[in-house]
């Protein structure tokens, strides 16, 4: 809502698209969720374009890439960004868009393997086949040959689920068009390529499904690909990639629980708000992780909500003595003691003195 922040710009906001936005990227610890690096930049810059600068800034800040693997989703994927990570000697696991011709050809070539039970893993519940790619690392002293792993995956029944959902959405569009009703703009933009207008022999015009377009869109349904220089085993690579759900939990905490989704402040104050919200998110994530690690028996986070836990702790009270400069803690219930233990905290002292 700010009219003074210079870096806000109109981007691709799904919520309140009439408002300009500021992009804010997190890099979080895979285990604890603690935010280890954050970068804010103009809202009109897409993730894939900003990725290179983010990695360079992490390098300049002294981030030690030798001890970590950078896991990113398809939103950051491009051949240029892959090359930057190779040149900077970053270990990475990168989700890949299926729009690359080399990826499509690989799926076509190894389609039989992706239907062979020998290539199936019951733990990850996925078929996988791996191939290698030859890349170059460009240094000040010339180029070096590098080998990357391209992992191809097929998720059983996912292609049928995608087909069913696509057919359902297309049918809804057809029903509206043939009833001369308006299709919601976003829905029409997404599905208009799957319908076409036809004419009967009597000259009657009607809307019909374009099966060729649907078949082309579903050709690689249920497929996924990863490119990496860090893990040769496709199932281990996918297991690591799936852990990036921690990032989504971070953003959920930032946007929905610490008031980080709206900047109701000026150009001189928004950096402070971003810092405070980032610290608050890290503290909440560390509390959630620590509490889950300490769960045992009946001692669990109530309703799996850290806010319910905090509410129970807020009920701990102390009364001031009338005859002394001290506070006396009221009796602490077993439930409150359990919540303190989940956070790794000791029970407060019986008497608190100024």
Locations of the language-model features?
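Anion-binding and metal-coordination hotspots
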Residues: 1-354
């Amino acid at each position: 809502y700010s009219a003074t922040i210079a870096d806000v710009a109109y981007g691709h906001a799904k919520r309140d698209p009439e408002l300009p936005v500021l992009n804010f990227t997190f890099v979080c610890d895979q285990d604890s969720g603690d935010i280890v690096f954050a970068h804010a930049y103009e809202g009109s810059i897409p993730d894939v374009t900003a990725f290179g600068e983010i990695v360079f800034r992490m390098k300049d800040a002294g981030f030690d890439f030798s001890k970590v693997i950078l896991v990113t989703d398809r939103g950051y994927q491009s051949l240029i960004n892959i090359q930057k990570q190779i040149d900077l000697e970053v270990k990475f696991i990168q989700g890949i868009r299926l729009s690359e011709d080399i990826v499509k050809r690989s799926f076509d070539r190894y389609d039989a393997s992706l239907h062979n039970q020998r290539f199936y893993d019951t733990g990850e519940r996925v078929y996988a086949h791996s191939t290698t790619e030859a890349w170059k690392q460009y240094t000040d002293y010339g180029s070096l040959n590098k080998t990357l792993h391209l992992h191809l995956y097929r998720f059983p029944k996912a292609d049928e689920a995608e087909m069913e959902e696509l057919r359902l959405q297309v049918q809804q569009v057809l029903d509206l068009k043939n009833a001369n009703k308006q299709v919601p703009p976003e829905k029409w933009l997404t599905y208009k390529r799957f319908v076409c207008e036809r004419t009967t022999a009597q000259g009657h015009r009607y809307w019909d499904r374009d099966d060729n377009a649907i078949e082309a869109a579903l050709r690689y349904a249920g497929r996924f690909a990863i490119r990496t220089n860090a893990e040769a085993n496709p199932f281990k690579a996918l297991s690591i990639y799936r852990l990036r759900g921690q990032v989504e939990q971070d953003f959920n905490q930032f946007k929905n629980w610490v008031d980080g989704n709206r900047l109701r402040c000026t150009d001189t104050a928004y950096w402070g708000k971003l810092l405070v919200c980032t610290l608050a998110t890290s503290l909440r994530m560390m509390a959630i992780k620590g509490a889950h690690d300490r769960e045992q028996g009946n001692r669990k986070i109530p309703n799996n909500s850290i806010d319910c836990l905090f509410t129970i702790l807020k009920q701990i009270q102390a009364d001031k003595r009338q005859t002394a400069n001290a506070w006396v803690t009221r009796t602490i219930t077993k439930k409150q003691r359990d919540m303190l233990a989940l956070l790794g905290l000791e029970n407060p002292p019986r008497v608190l003195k100024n």
